[in-house]
């Protein structure tokens, strides 16, 4: 059992290595092609659109055909779309193909995480998902470092990415882990969340907008500004590594304080760092620590917002709540590159940084305002979890049963069992 679980985690880390590399490489490649600003924004946001759709719909495919065949189907979609892209260098074709990649990646994560959740022993589940998330962040960060030694204009990077996805598919196909039975996730309660935890709604949507604009547009701008790819790779690596470093301390802080105050502080910090990047000297020793801070603030807005929603919602709604918040974050991620590319026409990269700062400050103001109107909950059924909507977890629940609801997140029952 442990070997099978390890295989699933390693396979997902390989997927994230490919995904982290693909995201930054594709941003650079779109910049090289010189598409119109609006078309470039649509192409860069199409991955997030596909990912969002996959996060909320792939459970139907998994429930219909089972985990292994669904994983093979999703992996095949991603690999095929990736290989075709250098053969069809057209913005409209790339929009469709990149959306297919996003949908397939979401399906891979949902299949893997629901499988892990159902099969990991309850006493080990927390450790399993901790290792899973660390592997996710490390692989995403390592993927950025691959940018330094590639020819952006060649088809080789597309082939290498497809090969990594194929390797993950082969590993999962040979696993001996028995796939779980699955059931449908309940309907997403948008109105309930908006009434119970409006800051969670705003936080997930705005954090998606901020992250989408950053990861899609900043690498492309850096290349256009004549910055060498090795420096781009280090900058993006620092941002992802900062996101990992912030998870535990911010999580502990949010478990002790009103989470809305933590959201407000993160928003102010992110805005300050984004504006600082406008004025600071753009030398590597100065920019790398700032990139790590930016990544830290940016990567913790979403999980704190999700934790705030879980504080306000009944335990039996957590799976549906998580799915709804992923969708909201995805909508924000689609909007980020679209708005950012238009701002870059008039303000260059400063437009993107001001967009990020403005969205973060708006969230901070909303969080402070709500905290003045409503007291925090007296009891919290859940603690902070390391989450990112473009990575994981998308599909683990609390029950430890073989019949696993998909497209959400809930480990409360496991924690309650350990406390009793």
Model-inferred region functions:
Residues 69-83, 162, 261-275, 357:
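Structural signature of the two symmetry-related core transmembrane helices
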Residues 107-120, 299-313:
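Intracellular juxtamembrane helix-capping segments at the cytosolic ends
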Residues 99-134:
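Cytoplasmic helix-loop-helix junction between adjacent transmembrane helices
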Residues 180-190, 370-420:
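Intrinsic disorder in cytosolic terminal tails and internal cytosolic loops
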Residues 147-148, 160-182, 363-374:
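C-terminal membrane-cytosol helix-exit motif in multi-pass small-molecule transporters
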